[in-house]
Amino acid sequence: MNTKTFTPKSTMKIYTCLCLLFLAGYLVAQNNTSALLPMPNQITSVKGKPFTVRSGKTAIYLSQPELQFTANTLQNILSDRMQVEIPLASESDRADIRLLIDPAMEGNEHYRIEITSKRITISGATVRAVYYGVMTMDQLLLGDVCATTQKKISPVYVDDAPRFSHRALMLDPARHFLPVNDVKFFIDKMAHYKYNILQLHLTDDQGWRVEIKKHPKLVGKDYYTQEQLAEIIQYAAQRN
């Protein structure tokens, strides 16, 4: 067996390389754009102090009742990433995080994010657009983990709309059956990356996965009931 002796000089080189690798990882962690996927059309760093999330003081305002699910999603994101519970506010001037529908914006998936030291505004042409803005907000928090752990969000301006209206992924439960909760998990990940169409391949030689009440012998052991498929459709619709 060959052996190699490490001299002080070679050991120092190894130590230096390890330090550089650690520093590179640290610098990436400091960049709040490092987790953005897909990359927004426009993202601009803004000079100034970060926005600080304050438990008991920070609140979320939604301009329309249709944004309720989106607001709840943002509440869950802030709870998961920062361990803070943020309430909803009934009036705009009492909230420093605002979710707004702006019909003047062109394109039904066009959204903007404006983060300053005093306020966060996520606006979009539609409910769907605002939801995608919240997904980008989550990625900003993931990309800037050092600030996120301190309940701070770096100031930034984002203006984004998708290049393609059809953004699809396929699941194949016909060949490899997936429980309902696994399908929902996949939908959550699709929403995070702004995919908007899920194709479920439900029938093939390996299995028929759709319940047909008039033909019960079509299905085997693993299949989706009509109620489960309706549940999946509703779950996906909420996440656009």
Language-model segments: which ranges?
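N-terminal secretory signal peptides that target proteins for export/translocation
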Residues: 1-12
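Acidic, contiguous N-terminal accessory segments
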Residues: 12, 20, 29-162
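Alpha-helix capping and helix-coil boundary motifs
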Residues: 19-21, 192
